[in-house]
Amino acid sequence: MINKSQFESLENELDVYAKKRQLNSDLAKQYIDDYFELLLLFFRQINEKESIDLNQLDQYPVVPMNFLERYQYMLKRKYHFMGYSQMKTLKNELIKMNASYQIRRKNQNNN
């Protein structure tokens, strides 16, 4: 199970590169790739999917607004500050939405 500390560990490394405007460096790119993969793995995990089917997003229980557009934006601008910033924002939204979903799910099972 992916936890918040795994993201924070990568963010600590990436924030240093971001402050120096070096997100496009070879070392930073590896951290960004790892962060992006962790984000996608987390998305699959909370939706209980083996892979992401972008045509079936409306069937997933936890999907932030404009996910497809944001996903495409992150792919295009992954190594830019705004792409990294979007990843962090999406991660925070997924954590909150998943917590809410798990509570609703638990309450439904108790009724």
Model regions: which residues?
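Conserved nucleotidyltransferase catalytic core and NTase-mimicking acidic/glycine-rich helix/loop elements
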Residues: I2-N109
